[in-house]
């Protein structure tokens, strides 16, 4: 396989983490990734919603494939201007207020940025004693203290703070000499850095791809819509790159790539998933198989939007997802190598390049079949022919 530029990987990850990108405030990170693609000479388009669809030309146009990572992160938004000069908070995405408490952040007004800290309603042990340990932990029990002379709602208004202002928490990245990486928002900026590095490896090596591949960078994965508007009907198979969950009861390892066989939306495509397992085995890539019960990704968004595609999920192993996340460079290397191997491999099924009738015409055909006296669905030619099994 073409080698990965690990210096590029680390540099890209740190630069991505330095750009605030909570869902809805992603223009800056989109511009950054577009610049990275420009530097690699990879053409792309930006959708109306702001996602990036790049193109790596292959020897054949069809069946085209996509490989996707998301640029958006968790965050928060102002929901209330309080009489004490602080602001109430609502989360962007799904995460616990436990991991917001004590976090430094930037609040984005319409005209300026204000630094601040997210704190429980009762913070000082000198003032509240044991009450700081018995207060509930929820978004209703935290507030943001802004580093500005503010003592009332009127002061907040005068400073330009409004309900609906975005807040981005500091990522606090730390790369250890032993390879461990700690930061908020490794989900999914670590995978974005890996995907860009994989693209660089392919460009630097001049490797020929068998079919067109479209690296996708989505901007609303954390709120569920993700890749739903980034596919154009020409994609036959899509692999999502995302965080994999290292926790008790899970098989994921922080130093390997995970191939997920099922998440809360159901099983991923059997043939595509097992192709990825086979590639990992063939190239000696350290990997784990896992299932995630409380998890969804861009793959689910694509299928729910009505796309007729095969989907799979591979990820970097990370501890404490949606909190103070930690992964290891070994896992990012493994994810990168598997991504390159996948992009250089043949399609899962050549028959996926055929244009199939749209869902409406199939539905009409099925209804007509069911309405024919003396003829069952199983007797209709459309349903009785033997379909190939596997990737044939």
Task: Please place each PLM-identified region on the residue numbering.
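N-terminal hydrophobic/helix-forming segments and targeting peptides
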Residues: 1-392
């Amino acid at each position: 396989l073409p080698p990965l530029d690990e210096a590029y990987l680390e540099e890209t990850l740190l630069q991505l983490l330095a750009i605030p990108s909570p869902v809805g405030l992603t223009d800056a990170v989109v511009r950054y990734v577009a610049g990275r693609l420009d530097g690699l000479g990879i053409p792309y388009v930006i959708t109306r919603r702001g996602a990036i669809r790049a193109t790596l030309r292959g020897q054949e146009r069809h069946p085209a494939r996509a490989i996707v990572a998301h640029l958006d992160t968790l965050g928060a938004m102002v929901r209330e201007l309080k009489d004490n000069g602080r602001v109430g908070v609502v989360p962007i995405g799904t995460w616990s207020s436990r991991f917001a408490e004590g976090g430094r952040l930037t609040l984005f007004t319409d005209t300026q940025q204000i630094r601040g800290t997210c704190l429980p309603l009762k913070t000082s042990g000198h003032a509240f004693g044991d009450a700081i340990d018995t207060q509930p932990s929820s978004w209703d029990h935290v507030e943001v203290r802004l580093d500005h002379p503010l003592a009332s709602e009127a002061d907040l208004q005068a400073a330009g703070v409004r309900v609906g202002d975005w807040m981005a928490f500091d990522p606090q990245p730390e790369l250890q000499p032993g390879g461990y990486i700690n930061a908020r928002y490794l989900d999914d900026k670590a995978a974005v850095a890996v995907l860009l590095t994989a693209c660089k490896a392919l460009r630097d090596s001049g490797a020929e791809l068998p079919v067109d591949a479209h690296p996708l960078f989505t901007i609303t994965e954390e709120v569920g819509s993700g890749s739903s508007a980034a596919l154009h009907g020409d994609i036959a198979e899509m692999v999502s790159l995302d965080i994999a969950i290292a926790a008790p009861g899970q098989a994921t390892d922080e130093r390997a790539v995970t191939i997920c066989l099922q998440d809360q939306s159901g099983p991923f495509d059997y043939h595509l998933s097992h192709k990825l397992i086979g590639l990992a085995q063939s190239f000696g890539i350290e990997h784990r198989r896992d299932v995630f019960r409380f998890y969804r990704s861009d793959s689910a968004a694509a299928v729910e939007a009505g796309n007729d595609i095969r989907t799979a999920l591979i990820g970097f192993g990370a501890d404490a997802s949606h909190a103070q996340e930690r992964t290891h460079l070994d896992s990012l290397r493994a994810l990168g190598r598997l991504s390159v191997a996948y992009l250089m491999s043949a399609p899962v099924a050549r028959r996926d390049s055929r244009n199939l009738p749209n869902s409406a015409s199939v539905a009409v055909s099925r209804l007509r079949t069911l309405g024919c006296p003396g003829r069952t669905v199983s007797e209709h030619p459309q349903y009785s022919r033997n379909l190939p099994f596997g990737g044939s």
